[in-house]
Amino acid sequence: MPELRHITSSALDELSREAFKSAEVERAAIVVLQGARSWGAHERGAITLPDDGGTLVFPVSYDAREAPYTVDEQGLERTLISLSDEEGYLACVWARPCQGSSLVGVGIDLASPRDFDTSERGRRLTELMFTDAEHDLVNATFSSNLPYGYAVAFGAKEAAFKATAAPLRTWYRSHTEELSYDLRHFSLVDPHRARGEARDGTAQAALDKMGIARIAVQYVEVAGMALVVATAFNT
């Protein structure tokens, strides 16, 4: 089994504090692991994470959108969880909200600047994923490193989209109306404050129906990639 490395840094600690500073949670953590997927930290059925010198094991299932979720012995989804893997790294954010907490969803994404380089594939991806306004934002804010800027902007979309997974599952437990939206309907609107929000009417209408009042995103650089965490709140 390949050696597993737990990535720690003051930047990741600060990211966790910022992501959950306005959320009432019993516990929450952002974990980044380096190693091949095959070493077993993440398998279809469970994820094992380092925790204060020991380990935590979450039983993991996947919904119709392939979003991971975990339930306790009573079959209740008390812990919110999201996963992302990229270039040999696995990132996880999990949180156990207090009763009555406004936190309803979490999302995480590792986005590589290599996907947004000057190659033909990179150019096609940026054209597909971003509006003119988003191109202007990235060019104005990340002019010295455009591929990283696009990775941040893409990671914000993906993480925000993932943060709606738990509210969407809750919606379908009592509704038959299909809510249709994708990650392109979200946008990083303020890279200095790292705010994310729904961009168009389709996504906003879905968020309103699910009771999501706001989605915040935070990001740091990890191994040259953008690590973005999103938190969804109902107030």
Region roles according to the model:
Residues 1-235:
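Core catalytic alpha/beta fold that binds nucleotide/phospho-ligands
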